[in-house]
UniProtKB/Swiss-Prot annotation:
Its main location: cytoplasm. It comes from Burkholderia thailandensis (strain ATCC 700388 / DSM 13276 / CCUG 48851 / CIP 106301 / E264). It is found in: Cytoplasm. GO terms for biological process: histidyl-tRNA aminoacylation; L-histidine biosynthetic process. Pathway: Amino-acid biosynthesis; L-histidine biosynthesis; L-histidine from 5-phospho-alpha-D-ribose 1-diphosphate: step 1/9. The gene is hisZ. This is ATP phosphoribosyltransferase regulatory subunit.
């Protein structure tokens, strides 16, 4: 086998793509900071049981596992940073009020999520801890939309769902709850034949409600139809009210209701959301409320957040990251070195052409040159 080959669905990031990713990373983290979010940096690997406190079988299957040569215990390479950030909030920071945290780092998946998906993603996201009200959900959704707009994405559609609907149906029907994971997979995949098979022997009300969920998709008026078709349970009524409120607050994106869009249901506990753009079949960002995740670390707190894959966003973003630069000669000249240093201190990119390599570099738009005029080094257009 050739030594330069990489594993399937793993790829190098070349300079032009890396520059674009880094430009977007800085933009998004700066925007998160403008909202008051503090950055944290969890480790890439942890003890497996710490990484798998939530997320169900899906997260377990996506997590790489290895044996720690120091302790002999099983380690995992993180497949999602959300549980790690919840651990930091619950166990390390231990704050009493609202905490806003953000993060950016690689995650690894044992299997790709789609046909062309990478198994190494650069996950970036934000989380709010300590507030159970819809204000936190609204802020997180707005921050996610801001991030996508900063990346230059247009015509964003925000799909809303609520984990409380399915939880309420399971709470009143033990038979349905017993096959919850299979039902979740059928609903998330809109697999109607499989859903019909799984619900054939359930109670009439539960069967009708579960079979209705894939059809409850569309604009906010779908919520009225949901009230007619779903059982009149207080938990379902509250969930639909929450979705109606959140939908009414979105001003800069199309809003759709999809009561079967249950990605990540295993650890979500309230409103869930996903962002889509034209030409991309899968969600470009997703998130939701997960109030119970911190319980495994000794301190459950209200929490909601979102994340996205920065490499995927960079692939579809129209943002141009080919930066302007100044081309300078290479000379043993103290005045030249001082001029180059001053320009770099001022934030300019200055590329000194090594002897015999005076051509313009492809990765930078050298639109200016540092030239000597009357014994002084000055910048001129090229």
């Amino acid at each position: 086998m050739s030594t330069w080959l990489l594993p399937e669905n793993i790829a190098d990031v070349l300079p032009s793509e890396a520059r674009k990713i880094e430009e977007l990373r800085r933009r998004l983290l700066d925007r998160f900071r403008s909202y008051g979010y503090e950055m944290v940096m969890p480790p890439l690997l942890e003890y497996l049981e710490s990484l798998l406190t939530s997320g169900g079988n899906e997260l377990r299957l996506r997590t790489f596992k290895l044996v720690d040569q120091v302790s002999g215990r099983t380690l995992g390479l993180r497949a999602d940073m959300t549980p790690q950030v919840a651990r930091i909030d619950a166990h390390l920071l231990n704050r009493q009020g609202v905490t806003r945290l953000c993060y950016a780092g690689p995650v690894l998946h044992t299997r790709p999520r789609g046909l062309h998906a990478s198994r190494e993603q650069l996950q970036i996201g934000a989380e709010i801890y300590g507030h159970a009200g819809l204000e936190a959900d609204q802020e997180i959704q707005q921050l996610m939309l801001d991030a996508l707009h900063l990346a230059g994405l247009k015509k964003i559609r925000l799909d809303l769902c609520h984990a409380g609907v399915l939880a309420a149906l399971f709470a009143r029907d033990a038979a349905a709850a017993g096959r919850g994971e299979a039902l979740y997979e059928a609903l998330a995949g809109k697999d109607v034949p499989r859903l019909n098979e799984l619900t054939d022997d359930l109670g009439a009300d539960t069967r009708a409600a579960l079979r209705a969920l894939p059809r409850l998709y569309g604009d906010a008026s779908v919520l009225d139809e949901a009230r007619r078709q779903l059982p009149a349970l207080p938990e379902i009524a509250r969930a639909l009210d929450d979705l109606a409120h959140l939908a009414s607050q979105v001003k800069d994106a199309e809003v759709a209701i999809d009561l079967a869009d249950l990605r990540g249901y295993a650890y979500h506990s309230g409103a869930m959301f996903a962002a889509y753009v034209d030409g991309v079949p899968n969600a470009v960002a997703h998130g939701g409320r997960y109030d119970h995740v911190g319980q495994a670390y000794g301190r459950a707190r209200p929490a909601t957040g979102f994340s996205l894959d920065l490499r995927e966003i960079a692939r579809i973003s129209p943002v141009e990251a080919r930066g302007a630069a100044i081309l300078a000669p290479w000379k043993q000249d103290d005045a030249l070195r001082a001029a180059v240093g001053a320009l770099r201190d001022a934030g300019e990119v200055v590329i000194q052409a090594l002897p015999g390599h005076d051509h313009v570099l492809d990765e930078f738009a050298c639109d200016r040159a540092l030239v000597e005029r009357d014994g002084a080094w000055v910048v001129e257009p090229r």
